[in-house]
């Protein structure tokens, strides 16, 4: 207790500024946590994020969340669409995989409202994205829905349909796909890889309006890497590396976009 008292620093505004100063010219800041759902930490993390945005010019928040779910938040803070009257409405509608204390909580809602207000008069708006890979089926759904509504992308639509058809027998349960891939060599590797490759080859054909181009490619990237993750999880501990590699790849994609 004496050592803690001697060396610890209260996480007040002045000491948060010291952290910001120590960050210097870093392009990526990773804010870890000891446990999910801790109100005090979520609040401190939000305050530090605000300082990095306001004082250091950081352009986006990337969280350990699903891409489709966080897109609802991204659209809300950038004013792209009205998917809820308040940030809390958006969060409650968008996040279903984990308990509400994970992302659909008061602290994230408060930060989301702040970010929306901060973005109002900015030409280059701050983004909010998810870089995890658990949304295998949701991401394929998003790609298929978008391409089905834009028939001019027929080649990419055919690839998306093949990927959807390949996963359809598993009833939207990734663990069923993992078991099948492990024991019967039923795999959808080529389908999701072909989809991502096709979208990247045609990326110039997609509009940047409301980040249409980024959204469709990132959902395909999630599908490709999620397939690898679930296929490997039954037979090899390296699936956790696959998840980490995906997060790094997602961050690089976002940095290129910005």
Set out the residue ranges of the language-model regions.
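Structured catalytic-domain cores with a bias toward divalent-metal coordination
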Residues: 1-258
């Amino acid at each position: 207790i004496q050592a803690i008292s001697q060396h610890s620093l209260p996480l007040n505004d002045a000491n948060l500024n010291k952290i910001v100063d120590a960050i210097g010219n870093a392009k990526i800041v990773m804010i870890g946590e000891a446990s999910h759902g801790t109100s005090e930490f979520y609040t401190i993390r939000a305050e530090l994020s605000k300082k990095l945005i306001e004082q250091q010019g950081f352009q986006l928040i990337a969280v350990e969340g699903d891409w489709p779910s966080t897109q609802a938040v991204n659209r809300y803070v950038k004013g792209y669409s009205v998917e809820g009257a308040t940030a809390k409405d958006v969060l409650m509608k968008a996040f279903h995989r984990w308990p509400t204390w994970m992302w659909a909580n008061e602290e994230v809602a408060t930060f989301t409202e702040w970010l929306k207000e901060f973005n109002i008069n900015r030409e280059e708006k701050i983004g909010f994205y998810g870089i995890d890979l658990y949304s295998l089926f949701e991401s394929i759904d998003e790609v298929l829905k978008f391409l089905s509504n834009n028939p001019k992308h027929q080649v990419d639509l055919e690839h998306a349909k093949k990927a959807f058809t390949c996963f359809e027998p598993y009833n939207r349960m990734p663990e069923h796909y993992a078991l099948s891939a492990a024991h019967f060599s039923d795999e959808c590797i080529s389908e999701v890889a072909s989809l991502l490759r096709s979208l990247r080859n045609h990326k110039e054909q997609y509009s940047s309006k409301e980040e249409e181009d980024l959204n469709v490619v990132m959902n395909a990237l999630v599908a490709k890497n999620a397939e690898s993750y679930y296929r490997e999880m039954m037979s090899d501990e390296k699936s956790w590396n696959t998840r980490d590699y995906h997060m790094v790849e997602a961050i690089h994609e976002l940095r290129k976009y910005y």
